[in-house]
Amino acid sequence: MKFLKVAVLFFGLAAAFAVRAQGGTYPVSGRVIDRLSRRPVAYAAVVLAGQEQKGASTDSLGRFRIERVKPGIWRLAVSSVGYKSLTTPEYMVSAATPFIEVELEEDAAQLEAVTVRPSPFRVTAESPVSLKVIGLREIEKSPGSNRDVSRIVRSYPGVAFSPVGYRNDLIVRGGGPAENKFYMDGIEIPNINHFATQGATGGPVSIVNADLVREISFYTGAFPADRAGALSSVLDFRLRDGNAEKQTFKATLGASEVGLSGSGHIGGKPTYWFSIRQSYLQLLFKLLGLPFLPNYIDGQAKVKTRLSERDELTVLALAGFDNMRLNVDEKGEDAEYLLSYLPRIRQETFTVGASWRHYAGRHVQTVTLSHNYLNNRNLKYLRNDDSSEDNLTLRLRSVEQKTTLRAENRTYLGRWTVREGVEVNYSDYTNRTLQRLYTDRTQLSDYRTRLGIVGWGLFAGAEYASADKRFTASAGPRADGGGPPV
């Protein structure tokens, strides 16, 4: 009873402090630059979307600061003479509000004043009807999603999910879970879930920390030509940049995990983001009396620096470590049935990549190098007795690796946008499976294989938009191939 009173008092005080904290205001600061020249845009108007009376103008260095903004999710509406008006993605305004960098595109035909009208929809010439942009508000407030983007998109037209309710296997337009592609700041991610099914893209828990996400583009058709291998859908994550003004840190305690994230700058130009999470599902599942005890750790990091006025370098890393052991002490008919066939599972996966971008007037060149790795291991003993190797029924170790180099160029020619690129990759797969099968006699299967494949891709595309934006067109071919296994 005493413990209950202390708990009620603790949560009451926490709620009171939370309500009091929400009553404060915070500044929103950032910088407005030209998208191609990377030079600051002076005297641009920056206002809160939906609250045009509250805003600021940029100074000669393109910097702005809006004071006394209420906490919550906001977008900025930015306009300047000679540039196309822009509404930014959604940002969370709090004590850890990020430094916001806005890129404006020139509009030489604009010679008179404009009125900024933010639209909740985004239409591109490349994917006019099959693109859905997921903002911060939808990530935070989607019911039942637990800030997991794979669960958010389940409610979209044409999207189904695995009949096993706890998994994030997406079935888009009648396809399969293996037909979805994931990209993060232009770098391919093979899977964004813990305890993944090898060869597919599902899993029960997302590796991606939503705190680092700026917005997500979800394509269900008309895929961009530079996204290889997409058959059903593409989820393209764009991450936030680190805070260029101050160091901020955040600790979280969730229903199944604890986490620590931070953002800031290193010296002058480089900015960083990082996130580390550790689950305590093993403790919860043991208290609930479940026969399996999953545990996971994941981490993300992003570093971005300006090498010069026209050159940027971004380094990205994403890693997940999964471990599911068996609770062999659990008794009962259901538990014994599950323990009879569930193996012990260990997985390690990571992706690391670097992207260099050069702005050369109307041309933007991007070179991306990335490597992803998956190590999947299953182990099972007869009656879960590992005292003797004679009881071994399954030992599996499967490793997948892929290294990708991609170079592309995008040219802006007034109403035309032209892009072209090339991609080279090398994939390596190894498998060693030792399995004992029980039929009318005992059979021992020892399977070993190794496979390496060199692949390539060529893509190009062009987009056109009329002066009044009433007519847009886009077309882009892509060719992929590969050499014989090595």
Predicted regions and their residues:
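Periplasm-facing N-terminal accessory domains of Gram-negative outer-membrane beta-barrel systems
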Residues: A21-A113, R117, T124
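Transmembrane beta-barrel outer-membrane domains
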Residues: G23, A109, P163, A230, ...
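Transmembrane beta-barrel architecture of outer-membrane proteins
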Residues: I73, D148, R167, G203, ...
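Transmembrane beta-barrel domains of outer membrane proteins
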Residues: A77, E105, I152, R173, ...
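Periplasmic N-terminal accessory/gating domains of Gram-negative outer-membrane beta-barrel systems
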Residues: K84, P89-M92, T97-I100, R117-F223, ...
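Flexible, surface-exposed loop regions and adjacent strand-edge segments
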Residues: V133-G135, T201, L290-N295, D329-L339, ...
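Predominantly transmembrane beta-strands of Gram-negative outer membrane beta-barrel pores used
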Residues: K181, E215-D226, S232-R240, Q247-P291, ...
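Face-selective signature of the C-terminal outer-membrane beta-barrel domain
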Residues: K304-D322, P343-V486
